[in-house]
Amino acid sequence: MQDLEIFLSIFAFIFVFYFGAHRTVMNRNKSDVPYLQ
């Protein structure tokens, strides 16, 4: 169970980091990313 908790925490951290970076890129370059609208 401890390994599962560590995996979930790492996955959540990566997901939040990717989501924040993706929103920043989308707000900065909306026309440069036509495949992720």
Curated annotation (Swiss-Prot):
Domain of life: Eukaryota
Cell compartment(s), UniProt: Endoplasmic reticulum membrane
Predominant place of localization: endoplasmic reticulum
One GO CC term, this protein: endoplasmic reticulum membrane
Keywords (A to Z) from UniProt: Endoplasmic reticulum, Membrane, Transmembrane, Transmembrane helix
Its membrane topology: Single-pass membrane protein
Segments traversing the membrane: 1-21
Other facts noted in the record for this chain: Present with 2440 molecules/cell in log phase SD medium.
Protein name per Swiss-Prot or TrEMBL: Uncharacterized protein YER053C-A
Species of origin: Saccharomyces cerevisiae (strain ATCC 204508 / S288c) (Baker's yeast)
